[in-house]
Each structure stands twice: as structure tokens, then as C-alpha cells.
A protein has these predicted regions:
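Short acidic-hydrophobic surface loop/beta-edge motif
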Residues: 48, 102-107, 132-134, 231-236
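Active-site-proximal loop/helix segments of hydrolase catalytic cores
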Residues: 120-188, 204
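Sec/Tat signal peptide C-region and signal peptidase I cleavage site
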Residues: 28-34
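Structural recognition of the beta-strand scaffold that forms the well-ordered cores
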Residues: 56-58, 80-81, 112-113, 140-144, ...
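Cleavable N-terminal signal peptides
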Residues: 19-20, 30
């Protein structure tokens, strides 16, 4: 993977109001510790609200593995897409759309995007994806909702230890399988984990994702909470890994 660290050092008066953590500039609005509320639209589309900002992840068209779901036609301050594939970067929502690696400031959030291959063969089949990291509502958040590529050591440093990790777990050609996802959770020592991109129903010829069960088996011993389609996370979140199942 290629890491992108593009945030510049603030100077003068701005330095007094900014915090810099492991290459990520934290703006005052995002530093507020009121936590976030999370709403799931299915697949890997989540709306995260808190710190004065609305962040939408991976809006989809209702095709392939997302067939039968209601498309997330909502408004957000910023949309963070893993790629421009139709099931994780579709133009169905309104807001500033980010999909390329780099450093951005939107709605009081400092957002870092890190380039990665989408598949296990260096992106030769599905091209690149972007891993996202930002701080919102006093929480460090990492979005790995659309990748199957191994995370290099330097990228693990950039991603840090997330309070909240969103990660694909269903396997197939472009998403971590259960064992791979569990290994990433342990590498990053994630505190709260939201698994996404897995098949909830029976087999489908148009979807190569598997169920969530292999991931839960690989994470045996961790606390699992079934939180429904929405829930809130308020810091501090503790050190133990907790899996938050949304549907």
C-alpha cells in the first residue's frame, strides 16, 4: 500500500486551536467528546453523526450484494467512499464526495485517506480503494469497509488504534474474509468494531459475500452486541474489543 501523509503543520494562531496526533490534525469541533450516533443503511453504508458533522460511508446502488436494500439517498457534510464501485461509491447521496487518498478538512473534521489495493492481487481485478481515518465526537474512527488487501506496517502506524473500526468481513474477491478481518482487528487493537459487507440472507448468484459467522468464530471470546439499525458510542470506550452487529 502507498501511504499518503499530506497534512501540513499549522502555524501562528492556528497552532493554539489544533491538535496533531500521529500525522492527523484534529480540529476543535471534531475534538469535542460528545460521541457519535451511527445509522446503518445496510451493506457498508453508515451515517455517522457527532461533533457537529454528518459523515456518510459507502453509499450504494441497489445492485449485486446490495440488491433489495433501500439506497441511502440522504444528505451529509462529507461522503467517504472506499471506491467508485456501484456498491460502495454510488452517486445517490448529497454532500462532498471523497474517494481519493489525501488529506482533507470538511465540516470541522480532519480526514486522512490512505491508498490501498481493493483485492488480494494488488488491485489488478478491482483497482484501488481508500482507507479512511478521522476523529469525530472525541473518537478515533477508521473505515476499512472496502478492501481485501493486507495492511502494511507503515499504514498501521497511520491508522493508529481506532476507538471505532468499520471493516468488511464477508470475503469474496474484494473484501476481507472472517479470518483476515479478525487479524486486522487484532493488528489495530480496535476497541469497537462494526462488521460490514457480509451476506445476511441465503446464497445469491449475484453476490460472492459470505455470512458473518466466520468472522464471529474468528473473534471468539470478544463481546458481541446486537445493536439494530442505530446506536451511539460515547467516549471513553475502554480497551476491550466489542463487536457491534448492526442490521
Amino acid at each position: 500500500m502507498t501511504a499518503h501523509r499530506l497534512l501540513s503543520r499549522p502555524s501562528g494562531r492556528a497552532l493554539a486551536s489544533l491538535t496533531v496526533l500521529a500525522g492527523l490534525t484534529v480540529l476543535p469541533a471534531a475534538r469535542a467528546g460528545g460521541g457519535v450516533s451511527i445509522t446503518s443503511y445496510g451493506h457498508s453504508a453508515l451515517l455517522i453523526q457527532g461533533g457537529g458533522a454528518r459523515v456518510l460511508l459507502n453509499p450504494f446502488q441497489a445492485v449485486g450484494c446490495a440488491a433489495g436494500l433501500a439506497e441511502p439517498r440522504v444528505s451529509a457534510d462529507v461522503i467517504l467512499a472506499s471506491s467508485q464501485l456501484r456498491d460502495e461509491g454510488a452517486p445517490v447521496a448529497s454532500g462532498r464526495f471523497l474517494v481519493k487518498p489525501g488529506s482533507y478538512r470538511v465540516a470541522g473534521l480532519a480526514i486522512e485517506g490512505i491508498g490501498a489495493p481493493h483485492d488480494r492481487v494488488g488491485g489488478k481485478r478491482f483497482g484501488p480503494s481508500t482507507l479512511w481515518r478521522w476523529r469525530q465526537g472525541g473518537l478515533e474512527i477508521v473505515h476499512l469497509g472496502g478492501t481485501a488487501g493486507a495492511i502494511a506496517a507503515e499504514d498501521r502506524v497511520l491508522l493508529g488504534r481506532p476507538d471505532l473500526l468499520i471493516i468488511g468481513v464477508g470475503g469474496g474477491a474484494k473484501i476481507y474474509d472472517g479470518q483476515e478481518a479478525a487479524a486486522v482487528v487484532r493488528q489495530l487493537q480496535a476497541r469497537r468494531v462494526i462488521p460490514v459487507q457480509y451476506r445476511a440472507g441465503g446464497p445469491s448468484a449475484s453476490c460472492d459475500l459470505g455470512s458473518i459467522q466466520p468472522f464471529l468464530n474468528a473473534m471468539a471470546g470478544s463481546t458481541v452486541r446486537r445493536v439494530g439499525s442505530s446506536f451511539s458510542v460515547v467516549p471513553p470506550v475502554g480497551d476491550a474489543t466489542v463487536i457491534e452487529l448492526m442490521r
